Amino acid sequence: MTGASPRWLLLAFFLALGYLVIGPPGRVPDEPGHFWHAQAIARGHFAPASRHAVDLYPLPSGMSTIFWVMRAEGHRLSPKDYEIAASIPHEPYGLRQTSTFPTHYTPLAYIPQTAVALLARAAGMKPFHEVYLGRIVNLLTALGLIALAMRAAPRYSTLILATALLPMTLYELASWSADAPAIGLGLLFCAFMLEPPEPTPRMMAAVAATALLLSLSKPAYFLVALLALFRPTPRRITVAAIAATAIGIPIAMAYANYAWYNARPGFVVDPDAQLRCIVAEPLRFAKVLWNDLRNNAANYGEELIGRFGWLDVYLPKAIVGLEGLLLVACGLTAAPALDARRRMAAIAIVVATFFGIVLSQYLTWSIVCAEWVDGVQGRYFLPILPIALAALALPSPRWRVGPRTVAVVAVVANAFGYVALVRSYY
């Protein structure tokens, strides 16, 4: 059985359109902040005025008002709410100082969103319509990258398709979130590492560009490049992947270090103080990591598959279990299986990336010296999911999960996702 054709992503597009239409503006995690950050970038504002300062930028007040109208808190949304939101002009009360969180992402994480912001500003588009145009463009950009991933690694394309059709993936793709292009870039880079291309100048440039953009967008996934150290990766592809990652990571980290600020006023959050706490008591921190894994692993898995709204809209447990079983089955029956060295490397990369993400959230989002970790969400692991699944592959599976099975489960799971959103917001 061959892998999945990129044409299966037409299903992903139509399923994502359902979330785009049903999901109210601003009800995807951090969507207002991503929207405002792209608007600030489109106006030439790329970083805070000073290190660790709250990144405020004067944006038209209508860009805040629409999210207040569509807040869906304490009441059910009605057509009247949408009518009011659609009528809001850019500047009903002039400019308003707006916090452009999450400012610690570099502007390269917002290329499609910034393009929409520039176009909408030139056309005089109202904020409400701009939100939906940006969602569509972000979705198409991410799906384009995922299609390239499926073409780059046809033997692992079913794993990529299964990741792309997850309710959580589609919900993120159909939003202004920087996660949308990052997921696309992450899956494309995983594809290059799982099924290395021939070292032609074109493919070397493609691998290097993908590694660089991913590093500058979401540096948490830099360890994926280490798969290039193992055969059958051609030496020049290895150099392209490692060198581009090595260039991008220091830039992204320097930007994040400068632009970070405490987005939790009232809580003592300080990365430098947190790091000193870790160094002073490493065994205590190891216990924090272990407790987080023990207590929250199931929760992260559920969020990976589908947790909507501001993490307050749930899929039925049975649907989460069905998707989980599908992912495991896709991984176990993937072919060809990784050889022993690449399998061990893949497992090490996934484990290290998991703990690296937990560490980053402990440093930048958790209270200093806390006994728990705040801020980790299961969706953060979507870009490396194909590598995790490929590491499960049996040496000689008697059968393989095909794209039709993946598609059927996706239709069922996302239908339940639509129902959950409608019941929560309308």
What is each of the regions a protein language model found here?
Residues 192-202, 222-248:
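Perimembrane helix-loop-helix junctions
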Residues 2-3, 156, 200, 235-240, ...:
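Membrane-interface helix-loop-helix junctions at transmembrane boundaries of multi-pass membrane enzymes
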Residues 147-148, 183-198, 210, 387-388:
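Specific aromatic-rich, kink-prone transmembrane helix
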Residues 254-337:
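Membrane-lumen/periplasm interface segments of multi-pass, membrane-embedded glycan/lipid transferases
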Residues 175-182:
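Short acidic/glycine- and proline-prone juxtamembrane loop motifs at membrane-interface regions
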Residues 3, 123-128, 149-167:
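Transmembrane-helix signature of polytopic, membrane-embedded enzymes
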Residues 45-133:
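Interfacial juxtamembrane loops and adjacent helix segments
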Residues 170-171, 202-219, 223-230:
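Membrane-interface alpha helices of multi-pass inner-membrane proteins
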